Amino acid sequence: MSLLMISENVKLAREYALLGNYDSAMVYYQGVLDQMNKYLYSVKDTYLQQKWQQVWQEINVEAKHVKDIMKTLESFKLDSTPLKAAQHDLPASEGEVWSMPVPVERRPSPGPRKRQSSQYSDSKSHGNRPGTTVRVHRSSAQNLHNDRGKAVRCREKKEQNKGREEKNKSPAAVTEPETNKFDSTGYDKDLVEALERDIISQNPNVRWDDIADLVEAKKLLKEAVVLPMWMPEFFKGIRRPWKGVLMVGPPGTGKTLLAKAVATECKTTFFNVSSSTLTSKYRGESEKLVRLLFEMARFYSPATIFIDEIDSICSRRGTSEEHEASRRVKAELLVQMDGVGGASENDDPSKMVMVLAATNFPWDIDEALRRRLEKRIYIPLPSAKGREELLRISLRELELADDVDLASIAENMEGYSGADITNVCRDASLMAMRRRIEGLTPEEIRNLSKEEMHMPTTMEDFEMALKKVSKSVSAADIERYEKWIFEFGSC
């Protein structure tokens, strides 16, 4: 296969397309695309590959245009069904298609119309002879022809629509009911669209088993979100579901990961809200956004509103740094959260709306918000068992050497957060690659095979990674978190 052959085939395909021979043009276009695909495998230069891929896309667009023209020409072709269909050929079940008019039997009239009836009988008797003409009223014949044509066309159109509907009908469209759309009457369309973008429609794909340790936190979130939907009759009255849960802890301990697990496992509408979502430069619009958020959550209930870094939105009121606009937003948020408890208002736990919040600065949160977040749980640093489990989760896709002892590595990581442990694993997994490419030129690195790069991670790699990656949380920070949770915690 040569470039000259590809060039000649492209030239022939374009010439046939210009001459109107679209069938031959499509054959050449398809051959050119296949030849270019084979040629791309032999090209090693990245720049040339990009250029050839761009040319392939342009040729593919030309082929699609020719294909569209062929489809358009096919639609112009008349059906071979005769227009003058007999009356018994039409389906009797189609009520909207009028039946053809019944021929009226003409009887000879007395008196002066005798001559006309004789002419009619003569023409009727000689109708089968060649060269004789039959007198038929032009308007009635034309109407009969039009009625027959309309009936046939109506039947064909209905069959085409029915076939198209059956073709487009997928199993997902049959099984999944149509979701209700939020009525945005009274609100700006842009505000509604901005909040709808924060609804997580795609699965974050984080399971409870992907989170090491944190048994109490997972148990509480299941009790607050999952169990009320499984046992709605139980969670009523004083047993109503929790309206708010606050996750407190150092950075990197898995608070956001727990929220992703809630979005994956709990099958509720999940709103991922940040401070930028509820902030606007126009006066009064931020409060409208807060109110609209909770109204949409009630509409799509059961729902979970996750507010990460809630201290940036609802910090302590009455300070000198507070602005009037932020104070109004806090007031609206507090009012809406107090009215969020769907279970306490209509005794229907399946229509609940729960606020799930996370913060690294719980001492900066307003007292009224702290009261509304009824469950305040501490997300601590992982224990020795949790660190070992987290190592297994992070390294499950890697090939480890026989000398790797995860229990010993976990003991050396005391004081490390979950994010720190993940960074250690990532750095250790890159050590073998760094040793392999040391001293090589870019061309030699590009020519390395996959087998040479995928080497097992050794214990020495983890020891070197531990020397490079330090813990990010100090003992003084841990003491401050434990003091706050001892005073205000509600686990």
Swiss-Prot record:
Residues 145-169 have a biased composition (Basic and acidic residues). PROSITE patterns: AAA (PS00674). The keyword Transit peptide does not apply. SMART domains: AAA. Residues 1-75 are annotated as: Interaction with dynein and NDEL1. Phosphorylation by DYRK2 triggers ubiquitination and subsequent degradation. Ubiquitinated by the BCR(KLHL42) E3 ubiquitin ligase complex, leading to its proteasomal degradation. Ubiquitinated by the EDVP E3 ligase complex and subsequently targeted for proteasomal degradation. Residues 87-185 are annotated as: Disordered. The modification Phosphothreonine is found at T133. Residues 1-185 are annotated as: Interaction with microtubules. ATP binds at G249, P250, P251, G252, T253, G254, K255, T256. Keywords: ATP-binding, Cell cycle, Cell division, Cytoplasm, Cytoskeleton, Isomerase, Microtubule, Mitosis, Nucleotide-binding, Phosphoprotein, Ubl conjugation. It catalyses: n ATP + n H2O + a microtubule = n ADP + n phosphate + (n+1) alpha/beta tubulin heterodimers. GO terms for molecular function: ATP binding; ATP hydrolysis activity; microtubule binding; microtubule severing ATPase activity; protein heterodimerization activity. It holds the Pfam family Vps4_C. The N-terminus is sufficient for interaction with microtubules, although high affinity binding to microtubules also requires an intact C-terminal domain and ATP, which promotes oligomerization. Can homooligomerize into hexameric rings, which may be promoted by interaction with microtubules. Interacts with KATNB1, which may serve as a targeting subunit. Interacts with ASPM; the katanin complex formation KATNA1:KATNB1 is required for the association of ASPM Interacts with dynein and NDEL1. Associates with the E3 ligase complex containing DYRK2, EDD/UBR5, DDB1 and DCAF1 proteins (EDVP complex). Interacts with KLHL42 (via the kelch domains). Interacts with CUL3; the interaction is enhanced by KLHL42. Interacts with KATNB1 and KATNBL1. HAMAP family: Katanin_p60_A1. Belongs to the AAA ATPase family. Katanin p60 subunit A1 subfamily. This is Katanin p60 ATPase-containing subunit A1. It comes from Macaca fascicularis. The lineage of its organism: Eukaryota, Metazoa, Chordata, Craniata, Vertebrata.
